[in-house]
Design a protein with these regions (language model features):
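Solvent-exposed soluble domains appended to multi-pass membrane proteins
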Residues: 1-209
Length: 209
């Protein structure tokens, strides 16, 4: 499954990422990735975006700003979620778009959330707007967010044998639904050097037998 994802693995450098967040607190994964800082010295249960991000933070975004990049954060969520309105400002994104669906047409939803495909089409529009100049975009999508109990809306191309875990099956099929964007990424990276980083911060699935 995930043929486009595995094709990208063959054509590029791939690996695994370990994050402090487990089954939640995705804002902490964002913070650690974008700054290179660890949450290892903060109390358990901390949410750095809402509790500790009160000043400008140097990291990947500020470095790319210095190199002349347009740095853009795109979110389908409101500024209040994990206080990303303040967080993305402190992380020094030049351009910040919240509730991005307000700027889109032909919006599709799944499980009450805007679909990955809709977000990716919008990213493609932004990419084309910045063609010919250095561009960095950061987004966190919501299509594959928990709960994983809406099988009627999922195309079940991946099935399990002798393993009863409907939530895990739905989760994998949701990831499979995102493969359209991976095809798009393969297409836009053919003529220019591009760095694509993909990782997930997801709810832990209860083990079943």
């Amino acid at each position: 499954y995930l043929p486009n994802y595995h094709k990208l693995q063959e054509e590029s450098i791939s690996g695994y990422v370990s994050v402090s967040a487990y089954g939640g607190y995705s804002c902490n994964s964002e913070y650690e990735f974008l700054t290179g800082n660890t949450l290892g010295f903060l109390p358990s249960g901390s949410a750095v975006f809402t509790q500790y991000l009160n000043d400008k933070q140097n990291g990947l975004v500020s470095w790319l700003n210095e190199l002349g990049y347009t740095t853009q954060a795109i979110s389908p969520c409101s500024e209040g979620l994990w206080d990303i309105g303040n967080a993305y400002e402190q992380l020094q994104f030049k351009d910040r778009i919240y509730n991005c669906q307000d700027r889109m047409s032909d919006i599709q939803y799944f499980n009450g959330n805007i679909t990955d495909e809709t977000i990716f089409r919008y990213i493609e529009e932004q990419y084309e707007r910045h063609a010919g100049s250095p561009y960095f975009v950061w987004t966190a999508t919501m299509q594959n967010h928990a709960p994983y109990d809406h099988p009627e809306g999922v195309i079940h191309e991946i099935t399990f044998e002798d393993y009863n875990n409907p939530a895990a099956q739905e989760y994998l099929n949701l990831i499979s639904m995102a493969r359209t964007w991976l095809y798009f990424q393969r297409r836009i990276t053919q003529d220019f050097d591009r760095l694509l980083s993909l990782f997930g911060a997801t709810r832990a699935l209860k083990r079943r037998r």
